[in-house]
Structure formats: C-alpha cells, structure tokens
C-alpha cells in the first residue's frame, strides 16, 4: 500500500499489566464516533478492493474476506499516506432492514477497550456492506504459535498475549453480563507491532451472516466445545473459560487442539496432556519444543494448573475470566 504503513496512535505497553478491577473501557453512553464511508471512498482506499486476506473457517465453512486500505488519520478520507485499515465485507440477512444493521454497528462502536480491535466505520451501499477496523500489523496469533515460517514466541511474550486476551474477554463478560463470545478462536486473537493483544469482536450475529447460530458456530470444532453444551445445549461465560483454557493449552504446547489425536492413544490434546499439566517433573514433556529450556518451569507448571481449572467438566469449578486474568498476571511474575 505504498507508504501507508503508519499504525493508529497507541499508548506504549506498560511494564506490567493492570488489574481489571475497574474495566479500562467504555460503553454507553459514550458516542460511537464511527465514520459512514461511501462505497467510492472504500473503493479508492483499497485500490478497487484488492484482496489481501481470506480467513476460511474449517468448522462451518464460512469465508471472511478482508481488504487492506489506506486513509488519512484525521479525516479518514482515502489517502496514499496515512494509516492502514482492514475492510471486512459483510453478508446481511435479507430480512434485516438497513436501519437495524446500522444500529447494530453503532452499538458495537460504543464498546471500547484497549484489547479489542477498534471499529472505525462502516459502509452500506451498492447492495454491499463493509466494516472498517484498525489494522494489526503482526496479524493473527495462530501464525506465530503454529506457523513454521515464524520464530517461536518467547515465554514472556506468550504470557503477555494470554493476559491481553483474558482481559478482553473478562471485559466483554462485564459489559454483556452473561453474553457468549462465540468467535473465541486462536485466529481472532490479533497482535499489534508490540505484540499487544487485540481480540477481534463483532458483538452480534446480526452484523454478518458468518456469525450464525450457536450450533453452527461449534460444528466441526469439537475440541473447543464445552461439555455442558453437549449435555444440555447450555452456554455461558464459563463456556468461554473452557474454550480459552483450550487456547491456553495450544499456546503452552504449540500444538493445535484439533491435532491432538496424533498421539499414540488417539486422545484429544486436552485429554492426553492432563496428567502432565500440574506435574512439574512432567511439564517439560508437553511444552512447545521450540522454547527449548528458555522458560521458567514453575511458571509453566502454574500455567498448566490454571488450564486444568479452566477445562474442568463442572462449570462451577471453573474460574471466572477475571480470575483467569488474575492468575495469568501472577504467572507473569514467576521467574523460575
């Protein structure tokens, strides 16, 4: 995109994460301050919608398409130099009115947190709908945990990323009370140039048809399905804790939860690793080998214990996301 490489202005990452006792956030009655883009503006900003990234869900077959654009930092007008943005194409339900869709977008725009990808604006014109987000230069976390071409993330960076993700989810639970975050997956955990975490959050299934029902959101990714959903069809905030526990396990081991059955007993990742998670003498056997010995064993063991709590079958025995956030902050302080 030429010289358009300047990120949105951000505060430098603090030396140590702040507790989430009072959410560093904003929700109503804060104004959404979203720009309503014209189709011609996005067409120019993205150089005629030059496709740059397609995310395909292996679980329910959706395709999510993003375009890279460049806009002026102050006016948000198309520009050769300025800030880079991500433009996501949406697919609306035909039964939904344009006004209803805009209200959903504005509602999302009123939710603000440093660990959520920022919504900048929207466009609904020419029978097409788009959402415009800030651009995250490091991309998705799964690229660094599972990607062969990237260097292994150091232990401290992994913990920092996990803390940011936990903080964003705890905040969403605080805002929505009992809302479910259906898009909690590794590829929705995005990173800026300083490896600060930004969770990609759409807020409502009404914004995009790819945000389908709870059932279709889980089809095919059984490794992330909390047991209470299988038993009763119930999902809640503690279901998010379970899913996040599986993601933490992937961060710890460098293995995909869906690849867990490659072990000799054909067990899923969270099943066969359980005996190793809280045993300091065994934890080395499941740690991402790319870390070598460059990590604090006590901290890794505490991470394993936290994961075991997150993936307990009984929802009442799982921690809240606030407690997960606190636990990860404690782990970050362990240096041996």
Curated annotation (Swiss-Prot):
Gene disruption: observed consequences: No visible phenotype. Slight hydration defects of wild-type pollen placed on the stigma. Slight hydration defects of wild-type pollen placed on the stigma of plants lacking both BKN1 and BKN2, but normal pollen grain adhesion and pollen tube growth. Partial suppression of the pleiotropic phenotypes conferred by the dominant mutation zed1-D (e.g. high-temperature-dependent growth retardation and autoimmunity).
InterPro entries: Kinase-like_dom_sf, Plant_Ser_Thr_Prot_Kinase, Prot_kinase_dom
Protein modification: N-terminal myristoylation is critical for plasma membrane localization and implication in defense responses.
Keyword field: Cell membrane, Kinase, Lipoprotein, Membrane, Myristate, Palmitate, Plant defense, Serine/threonine-protein kinase, Transferase
Organism: Arabidopsis thaliana (Mouse-ear cress)
Domain Protein kinase: 52-332
Protein name: Inactive serine/threonine-protein kinase BKN2
Lipid-acceptor residues (S-palmitoyl cysteine): 4
GO biological process: defense response; pollen-stigma interaction
Chief subcellular location: membrane
Annotated lipid attachment (N-myristoyl glycine): 2
Region feature (Disordered): 1-25
Domains as described in the record: The protein kinase domain is predicted to be catalytically inactive.
Pfam families xrefs: Pkinase
Tissues/organs with expression: Expressed in stigma and ovaries in flowers, and in stems and seedlings.
Family, similarity comment: Belongs to the protein kinase superfamily. Ser/Thr protein kinase family.
